[in-house]
């Protein structure tokens, strides 16, 4: 079953799903802006197109992840994103 989600007044939209190859996941698109997300479980984020400037929990420096790159976010944490252009992603819930 697909589940549609919308955050930050429609600037971030995702579709959640479960499959045998990825497990529980969501795909989505972020418009330009700055966002903070909280996690319940650990997440693996893959940038599909565009780029994300990311500040991970416990870090003091931002890091840019471009299309094809992956970063991991611990569970029970918050991470920050800066998005300069519309960017798509795949989020796997680990």
Curated annotation (Swiss-Prot):
Q: Which residues cross the membrane?
A: none
Task: Offer an example of a GO molecular function term for this protein.
Answer: guanosine phosphorylase activity
Q: What is its EC number?
A: 2.4.2.1, 2.4.2.2
Keywords linked to the UniProt accession: Glycosyltransferase, Transferase
Return the Pfam families for the record.
Answer: Ppnp
> According to its record, what are the GO cellular component terms?
cytosol
What CDD domains does the record point to?
cupin_PpnP-like
Q: Which reaction equations make up its catalytic activity? A: a purine D-ribonucleoside + phosphate = a purine nucleobase + alpha-D-ribose 1-phosphate; adenosine + phosphate = alpha-D-ribose 1-phosphate + adenine; cytidine + phosphate = cytosine + alpha-D-ribose 1-phosphate; guanosine + phosphate = alpha-D-ribose 1-phosphate + guanine
- Gene3D superfamilies per record: Jelly Rolls
State the superkingdom.
Answer: Bacteria
Q: What does this protein do?
A: Catalyzes the phosphorolysis of diverse nucleosides, yielding D-ribose 1-phosphate and the respective free bases. Can use uridine, adenosine, guanosine, cytidine, thymidine, inosine and xanthosine as substrates. Also catalyzes the reverse reactions.
| Protein family (similarity comment) | Belongs to the nucleoside phosphorylase PpnP family.
In its UniProt entry, what is this protein called? Pyrimidine/purine nucleoside phosphorylase
Biological classification of the source:
Bacteria, Pseudomonadati, Pseudomonadota, Gammaproteobacteria, Enterobacterales
């Amino acid at each position: 079953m697909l589940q549609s989600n919308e955050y930050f007044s429609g600037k971030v939209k995702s579709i959640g799903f479960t499959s045998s190859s990825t497990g529980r996941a969501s795909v989505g698109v972020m418009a330009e802006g700055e966002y903070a997300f909280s996690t319940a479980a650990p997440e693996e984020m893959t940038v599909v197109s565009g780029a994300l400037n990311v500040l991970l929990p416990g870090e003091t420096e931002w890091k840019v992840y471009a299309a094809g790159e992956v970063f991991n976010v611990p569970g029970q944490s918050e991470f920050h994103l800066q998005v300069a252009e519309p960017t798509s992603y795949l989020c796997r819930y680990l």
